[in-house]
Amino acid sequence: MRAFLFASVAVLQVAFTDVVGACSLPQPAGKVILTVTGHIGACSDQREVRLDRAMIHSLPLTEVRTKNPWERGRATYQGVLLRDLLHYVKAHGKMVELSALNDFHTEISIADTKKYNILLAFRRNGVELTVRDKGPFFVVFPFSDVRKLETEERFAQSIWQVNHIEVK
C-alpha cells in the first residue's frame, strides 16, 4: 500500500510539473501593457500571455526608419518585430488580430509577419509612445524600404494604441 501511494504521488508530481513547465514565461512584475491570446504554445496564465514593459524590452529590439502618412518626413521607431513576439509566445496560426484601446481591430497574416519587418513600436525618435501619441504600441510597416507596402490595406493595418493580440 505504501509503495502504491508513493508511486501515485510521484505520477501526480510529474504530471503537475509537465503542466507547470509548459508555462515557461515569467509573470509580469509591472503593469500589463500587452496581452496575447489564442493559438499560443507558451503561457503565463494558461490561456494568455500577459506582458509588462520590462518583458517587452527584454525581447530582441529593432529599429525601423520610415515614413508614413501620419508623420512629416521619416521617423525612427524602436520596438519588437511582430514575428519575434509571435515566436516568443510560440504562436501557431495563420492570422493575428490586433486590437486597440478604442476597440479598433485589424488582421495581419502570420506569413506577412515573416516576410516583412513589421514592428510593434513603443518608441518614436527615442521617445516612449504614450496613449496620446499612438502608444503603448504602434504597428509600423517598413514603407520606405518596401514601397509596394504603401497601400490603403497596409495603412489600415498600421494600428496604434495596440493592447491585445489574438493568434488565429
Language-model features: locations:
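Bacterial N-terminal signal peptides
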Residues: F6-A15
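N-terminal intrinsically disordered, low-complexity segments enriched in P/E/S/T
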Residues: G21-K168
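Positively charged n-region of N-terminal signal peptides that target proteins for export
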Residues: M1-F4
